[in-house]
Structure formats: C-alpha cells, structure tokens
Amino acid sequence: MADLDDIKDGKDFRTDQPQKNIPFTLKGCGALDWGMQSRLSRIFNPKTGKTVMLAFDHGYFQGPTTGLERIDINIAPLFEHADVLMCTRGILRSVVPPATNKPVVLRASGANSILAELSNEAVALSMDDAVRLNSCAVAAQVYIGSEYEHQSIKNIIQLVDAGMKVGMPTMAVTGVGKDMVRDQRYFSLATRIAAEMGTQIIKTYYVEKGFERIVAGCPVPIVIAGGKKLPEREALEMCWQAIDQGASGVDMGRNIFQSDHPVAMMKAVQAVVHHNETADRAYELYLSEKQ
C-alpha cells in the first residue's frame, strides 16, 4: 500500500481546457446508457457509423439449408471478414470459437419451422443467456399484418424491457404478413412500429421506390436484409442503393454464403458499406478477389 508521504500532488490539470463531452452519434441512440452504447459501438463502426453483419441464423426455421450444411466448414472462414455475426445460441456455443472475438447478435425468436405458420413465434432466448454469451444485441422477428402480429410485437416488447435492464440492444427484423405487399408503405409501417416499441436497430428489406422515406421515418438505424440469392452485381447494387439512401449497414446471409466466392463477396460488400464504393467499383473488386 502506498505511503501517504509518497503521494505527490497533481500539477498538470490543464485548467485552460474544459473536459470534452463526446456525443454518441448513432441515430436515435444518444440517450441510451453507457453499456448499451458500448455494445452498439461494437456493432456499428464508430468511424463510419455503419456495419456489415453476416447472418447465418437461418437454420432456426429452415434447418441445414444450402450453404449452411456445415457451419464449421462453409461459414467459419468468413468470420474474420464480417463486422458482426448473427446466429443462434446453439450454433454460437457449438461451432463459433470464443477466440473469434467478433460482436454477436443472437437470434432470440423462434419455436416454429418452415412447415408451419412462420409468424407464430415466441421468445426463444432469455436475457440472462444473452448476457452469459457476451452478445452485443438480440434479434426477433416482428410480423406486422400477419395472423400473429400481436404476439410478435409482444415478443419485441418483452426483449426490449429485459434488454434495458442489462444494457442489451434489441434488433427487430421485419417479416412480411401474408396479405401485405413488400412496398414502401408496408415497411414504413413495420419499421416505425418496431422503433416505437423501443428497439434500437431495425432490420428490413430494401425497396426500389421510397426507401429513403422508410429510413427518414424510422428514428433508429436501419440495416437491410440481403434476402434471396441474387447475382453478385445485383446484390452489390442493392447494397449501394440502400447505403446511398441512408441505411446504416447490411445483414447479409445467402448473398454471401451461397456465392461461388463468398470471401470476395464479403470484401466487396465491405467496400460499399464502409468505403463508399459504387456497385461497379465493388464488383470489380469482387472479380479481382475471386481470382
């Protein structure tokens, strides 16, 4: 223990320099507590304010779909090229090495399969387990306009309330109700409702007409879903259009792991999201990286 006589009085207090208050600039997240902002800072690159998530949680309702037959062989080599991993707790514990050291968004809704009504989901993860697994956010579907709309919104509310107690962000993932058209009007409704319920991130689909209005009407960051597999050039164009119109990143799965050259595709997507490269430039990068 230090002797009282050994403690020297401080001298360099820089009294001419007031302490700076550094604002947290992620859209709509300035009033959150330190722990939640810290987790969001791991998801969204503080320099660019954007993120490239690698989604491989599809097995929770699709099983071993194409590209996800062996996570350890097909997906693990992609980890280092992603900003964030999105998966289930089962895959995280059984396949993802703890030394991977990537922020994780955990799938927190489920309890149904592709063989049944997908919107009939429940919360499938406790917040205690999310904290135990050192995740940076939890994610759940919200099915506006579906038969089980009410339950999916309740799931989101439950996760938001539990997350606020421990500083864990919640990401709402907009599923499409059977009778709803995938257009700006629908996604404006779905994203706004999810944000009003308190979610800190929204994952939704890009639409060609009016996407900038979806982003403007949503008070928290939007990341786009990759959706079904597209030709690489088209997928990069979708990324560029979304980022150009205000999206805060992408959460892509099939357009990465079902590509013939997934590492090259990851690098091309990173170029669009973090380096403002056009789709043409990113596609040139993809072609050069796949050699």
Swiss-Prot record:
Its EC number is 2.3.1.245. One of its GO terms (molecular function) is acyltransferase activity, transferring groups other than amino-acyl groups. Keywords: Cytoplasm, Schiff base, Transferase. Its main location: cytoplasm. It is found in: Cytoplasm. SMART domains: DeoC. It comes from the Bacteria. InterPro entries: Aldolase_TIM (IPR013785), DeoC/FbaB/LacD_aldolase (IPR002915), DeoC/FbaB_aldolase (IPR050456), FbaB-like (IPR041720), LsrF (IPR033673). The active site is at K203. One of its GO terms (cellular component) is cytoplasm. It catalyses: dihydroxyacetone phosphate + acetyl-CoA = 3-hydroxy-2,4-dioxopentyl phosphate + CoA. Homodecamer. HAMAP family: LsrF (MF_02052). Belongs to the DeoC/FbaB aldolase family. Involved in the degradation of phospho-AI-2, thereby terminating induction of the lsr operon and closing the AI-2 signaling cycle. Catalyzes the transfer of an acetyl moiety from 3-hydroxy-5-phosphonooxypentane-2,4-dione to CoA to form glycerone phosphate and acetyl-CoA. NCBIfam families: PRK08227.1. This is 3-hydroxy-5-phosphonooxypentane-2,4-dione thiolase.
